[in-house]
Structures are given as structure tokens and as C-alpha cells.
Amino acid sequence: MNQLSALKQFSIIVADTSDIKSICKYQPEDATTNPSLILQAVSSNTNQNFVDQAVQYAKKKGGLYKDQIINASDKILVDLGIEILKKIPGYISSEVDARLSFSTEASILKAKKIIDLYEEQGISRNRVLIKLAATWECIKAAEELKKDSILCNLTLLFSFAQARACAESNVFLISPFVGRIYDWYISQNLLSKSFLGKDPGVISVCKIYEYYKKYGYKTIIMGASFRNIQQILYLSGCDRLTISPVLLKELESNTAKIDRNLAPPSFISVPPVALSEEEFRWEHNQDAMAVQKLSDGIRNFGKDQLRLEKIFSKKI
């Protein structure tokens, strides 16, 4: 048995791609996208029909020029998501514009718009996860959206404070970023590349997993942003793991035996009192890595959203 097949016995495998061929090949349960992956898909010649459909939709809907560009961007996000859903049995994660990450109200409105676009084409909201950056504002947005049966994937999660706030707000799923945490420590010369046992990205997910399971939180943990298969295998047993096609291929080609490393405890303890907003902000800001990587992630996803809109601005 190859390692990918073996890993599927311990964790639900999710494809971190918008590439249909890769999704068909590796047969994941779910798939995740982000602004960078959507931009990559739009830039591919094979997806120009989706671009044309989005432009036609935006023009037909009308309105101000800037609104048409935004409508085209939202439309292609959903159309690519629908195409992926044809190939998987589970969820597609579609991301809200990162520039809205500090507005609860704006994030809620955009999430509802995305869900409406899916439902207009016959896709139930119970197959879509709305991706939001794990800011306080978006965590609160996810809490409200869940009341309308809109489930969210809180992404760009780097600090334990973010993880706690998500669990305490009963959000559906979090995506702690293993690789980006690892990258920061490497860039600061604080870590040897060869010593996985002290990989802070892996340690972070293990800590979150143990905490969630100890206190019986229902929020799903989906390890994300991997740099090598060793990070993935170290987290075997994590609820979900979202993996790029390059690493899925490597797992499929390896046959070395793997064991389950993460498993829930046999008993559950009473959880602590939830963090207040002030406590959350203080705790999160004690972690220099998390502060930098969250802001970098929001900023870079925002840049890719602008690049996507620039493509449509030339077509509308």
C-alpha cells in the first residue's frame, strides 16, 4: 500500500488545488482553493471558458464598472468551485476577498453572496466552506454565518490564540499553516531544516489537536501549507490534511509503512473560560511569527485578488 492510501485510513485527505486533472487523479474527499490558486487557474488557457462566462455574467448583471469586475471575480470563483465539486464527494472551500478581513459585516455579506451564487446553480450550501482569514472579525463572522447553516474554514491560522478563539466560537473548521510557520523560523535562522521533531509548524498543529480533543471542541482541524511529506506524515491522524498535487504524488510513490501519530484522548475535560476580544488580541500579538505571517498572508491574497480583478478589467 502506498503512503497516500495508508494516510487515508487515519485522516481525511483534501486536495489543495484548483487543477481538475490532479483532483481526478488523487481522489480526495474535499478540495481547497485560495486567491492565488484561482488566479493561477484563470491564467491557464484551459479555463478561458470560465473567464468568458464570468464576463458575460457580469455584463448582464450590469451596474457600475467596478461592481461588474467584482461580480466577474465572484462568479469565476464559484464556477471553478462547481467544476471541482463534480469530481469530489465532499466540500469545496471558496475564499472571501482578503481585503474584507477586518470587517465582520462585510465578510458576512460576501460569504452570503458566494453561497447565493452556488445555490443559484443548484449547489447546496452544505457542500461549500467559506474561507475567511482567522482575524477576530472573521472568527465572529463565521460564528454568525453558522447560524444560517453557512460553514466556514478559518485560514491563515498561525497562533494558538487564533485556534482557541475559533474553537470557542464553534467555527466549523480551521486550517493551521504548517509550512508558513516553518518558513518563518528558517528565515530567522531559528531552526535546522533536518530536525523535523522540532518543526514549529508541526508542533503547533499537535498542540492545537491535543487541546481541542482534550476539551471536546467540535471544530475540525485541517493541517495545511506543507513543505514536505515528513510534515504530513508526522500529523497522520489529524482530522483533515490539505495537500498540494506535488506532495500527493510523492506520497503515492512511496510505500514505506506509516503509523497514526495523532489520536483523541479517552476522556474529555471541562474547557476553560473563552477568551475575550482583548485577551485574544493580546495573546495573538505576543507571537511575532503569527503577527507577521497573518498580515503577510492577508496582504498577498489581497494582491492576488487585485491581479484577478485586473484581468477582468481588461475584458469588461
UniProtKB/Swiss-Prot annotation:
InterPro entries named in the record: Aldolase_TIM, TAL/FSA, Transaldolase_1, Transaldolase_AS
* Xref: Gene3D superfamilies: Aldolase class I (3.20.20.70)
Catalytic residues (UniProt): K131
Q: Which UniProt keywords apply?
A: Cytoplasm, Pentose shunt, Schiff base, Transferase
GO molecular function term, any single one: transaldolase activity
Q: Spell out the GO cellular component terms annotated for this protein, sorted alphabetically and separated by semicolons.
A: cytosol
The protein's annotated catalytic reaction(s) are:
D-sedoheptulose 7-phosphate + D-glyceraldehyde 3-phosphate = D-erythrose 4-phosphate + beta-D-fructose 6-phosphate
Q: In which pathway does it act?
A: Carbohydrate degradation; pentose phosphate pathway; D-glyceraldehyde 3-phosphate and beta-D-fructose 6-phosphate from D-ribose 5-phosphate and D-xylulose 5-phosphate (non-oxidative stage): step 2/3
Q: E.C. number, please? A: 2.2.1.2
Output one GO BP term: pentose-phosphate shunt
Q: Where in the cell is it found?
A: Cytoplasm
Please tell me which top-level EC class this enzyme sits in: transferase
Q: Pfam families, from UniProt?
A: TAL_FSA (PF00923)
The record's note on quaternary structure and interaction partners says:
Homodimer.
HAMAP family from the UniProt entry: Transaldolase_1 (MF_00492)
Function text: Transaldolase is important for the balance of metabolites in the pentose-phosphate pathway.
* Family according to the record: Belongs to the transaldolase family. Type 1 subfamily.
Task: Tell me what this protein is called.
Answer: Transaldolase
